[in-house]
Amino acid sequence: MNYALDNGHKWNVMVGRYDYELGNNMGLIYGNNFDGAQLKFADNKMAATVGYGKFKEGDLNDSKTAYGELEGFFGGGSVAGSAVGVYYNDFNASSGVSAGDAKVWGAYASLNFAKKFNLNAEAYRVNYDKASVADADGFSAKLKYGKAKFDTPKSWDLWVNYINIEDGAADDSGTGSWRTNVNNTKGWAAGADYTFAKNAQLQVFQTFDTKIEKTGKDRDELTRAQFVFVF
């Protein structure tokens, strides 16, 4: 259930199962099904979100979490639509075969510039309470030119992306990323999106120079193409 609490639609409550991207940006740690409740306030300058519930996919399945997000929106002209945000999670996490309480602290910045460019960067830390489980950091950056919109046929974009995710800083079975491997991974990727009809898009992805973050050994590269339809 998604319900606006006021006529101006600034206050919104969501209850039940919904798609949750941890950090409300790239969803690297987790971006999948979630059972819970969320309260959000948003206007054209800022947004504040709090929520509580259970992850329903991956290694984090059935782990409970409380989360909070604070975002600010800014810019005019070619910078319009830019944003910065911080987020916090407190949950029962899982890293390989080791599990324990953990806290996530993160921040992101999404900057529009030069009319058609966007630079999106995110950094976070997973602090495990259990002494035997090492804390883990994650970083990702994506530079994009253009903007493929589902409601705008023939719109397109090109992008390049870099990630450096330490072991224990992502859930490969629940991540919102298109990559096969996110946890314990560093490397580059490039891709393109093209809207060939309204609500229909072709997306292509290619990784390169992908390594296991902990050892520096090569990972298998991934080539992927997909059609996405929205209704």
Set out the residue ranges of the language-model regions:
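Outer-membrane beta-barrel pore domains
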Residues: K10, G77-Y88, N92-F231
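Outer membrane beta-barrel
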Residues: M1-G85, D135-D172
